[in-house]
Amino acid sequence: MRFAKENPLIEGYFSRRKCLQSILIGGQSILFSEHSTAGAQIEEPLMDAVRTALTSAIANHAPPVPEFKDTESRIRYLRWLVAMSDRLKKKKPEWQIRKEFLQTVWYESKRAGLDETLVLGLIQVESNFRKFAVSSVGARGYMQVMPFWTRVIGDGDASKLFHMQTNLRFGCVILRHYLDREKGDRFMGLGRYNGSRGKSPYPDAVLGAARNWEFSG
């Protein structure tokens, strides 16, 4: 597959159609462009209670240091980390960077009550693991968070969406919010996340990509 040349200052853009056409489902690898997709969350009115809950959810109370209830859980996490690190090596060649990224994905996924497999699939589709990806509609970072969210539930500084943990926290909290609104329906929740509620291409792409990150332990 041919990729567009990468702009050294800002990520270029591929259309969602071209990104989705590159998916090969059914045990094969899923290939994506080096650029972000064009979907975007839609700003909607939030009840005060919801806004307060989301604001609290993104508050940075602790660094992403995994905690385990027993040795077995810790060993399973370490096995997951090794397996995911091997799969991510082509995208992030440096071990320390891979480790920090995966550790943060795991932490923020668990914190938001999400399956880390789903989160990794979403990141693959949204940004192809590009920290500084920017879409044609302005969504930023790994999880392509729209800047308006920093105003709605953050401090208004959209530049922080290029910070790894901040982006992953916002993304996970927003995804959790959308899934809750859809009563746990992944298809509809993912559609909301992408601003394409009720349409199949995006949810199908994320759920397909998530298969690349399944781990049996």
Q: Which positions does each model-derived feature cover?
A:
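Catalytic glycan-binding domains that act on GlcNAc-containing polysaccharides
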Residues: 59-217
